[in-house]
């Protein structure tokens, strides 16, 4: 909370959480700030009889945050829909709300044969309905974050998302995306700011969407110190989700082994391993 006024501020911040039946949980904190001061507020409470969110039962709550003056006058109010769900990795298996999760997913580009790369809400919803009818439960936003309306619809209708940062390094000396530490952007400090800005912008914008269960740091961009720092930041900022990074090749910068275009023999070899350490998701095949 940032006091943009040139005078001190006294008042309160109220948080209301409303479920689909209108049941409300309310919390409030008093605040006193000097001019220009910034403070961080956290609210903690137990929500009774939580209705968990999943792709099969997309239960949502509406959170409303209201800033009031000491006399009760409303200064500002904002709201968003969110949900409660738990994503885990146990014994190299991906779990949602304690149940093993099998990803049946696709990659998504903004494209329509009639409108080109302009996709509106109606077209988004048509795609979601088509996917749900065909037992598709997950989407990778290849290779960039989608409009916020897409995430709202996935929250509402129940699609799991791998949210991918708009980073790609084709044409930067990446013969088959191999590592070139002398000049590749993933290793060069002068490129760190550009990489991290895109990753942080994605996380901060989409962090309240329950449909987002995995962050992807980018597509086909090699792997180096730039991504090591980005991975560390994501894990510190958001401990409720996991990181998928295809170029990590199952190393320390990814929580999920997520190769592209593996052969059937390679997938069988992985499936028959006695002690796998990470879940396995084929993240791209036939450019889809």
What positions do the PLM features span?
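Secreted/periplasmic carbohydrate-active enzymes, especially glycoside hydrolases
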Residues: 1-161, 198-199, 213-214, 230-236, ...
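Substrate-binding/catalytic cleft of secreted carbohydrate-active enzymes
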Residues: 128-131, 138-288
């Amino acid at each position: 909370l940032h006091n943009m006024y040139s005078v001190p501020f006294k008042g309160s911040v109220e948080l209301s959480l409303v479920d689909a039946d209108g049941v409300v949980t309310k919390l409030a904190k008093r605040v006193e700030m000097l001019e220009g001061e910034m403070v961080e507020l956290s609210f903690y409470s137990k929500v009774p009889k939580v209705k968990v969110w999943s792709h099969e039962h997309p239960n949502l709550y509406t959170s409303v945050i209201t800033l009031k003056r000491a006399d009760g006058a409303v200064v500002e109010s904002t709201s968003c829909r969110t949900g409660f769900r738990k994503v885990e990795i146990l014994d190299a298996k991906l779990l949602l709300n304690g149940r093993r999760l099998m990803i049946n997913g696709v990659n998504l580009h903004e494209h329509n044969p009639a409108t080109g790369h302009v996709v509106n809400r109606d077209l988004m919803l048509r795609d979601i309905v088509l996917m749900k009818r065909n037992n598709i439960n997950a989407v990778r936003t290849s290779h960039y974050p989608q409009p916020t309306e897409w995430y709202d619809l996935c929250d509402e209708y129940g699609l799991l998302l791998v949210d991918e940062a708009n980073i790609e390094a084709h044409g930067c000396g990446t013969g088959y995306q191999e590592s070139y530490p002398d000049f590749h952007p993933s290793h060069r400090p002068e490129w760190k700011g550009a990489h991290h800005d895109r990753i942080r912008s994605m996380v901060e914008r989409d962090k309240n969407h329950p449909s987002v269960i995995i962050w992807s740091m980018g597509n086909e961009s090699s792997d180096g110190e730039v991504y090591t720092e980005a991975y560390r930041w994501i894990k510190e900022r958001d401990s409720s989700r996991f990181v998928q990074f295809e170029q990590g090749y199952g190393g320390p910068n990814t929580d999920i082994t997520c190769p592209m275009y593996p052969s059937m023999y390679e997938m069988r070899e992985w499936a028959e391993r006695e002690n796998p350490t990470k879940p396995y998701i084929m993240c791209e095949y036939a450019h889809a």
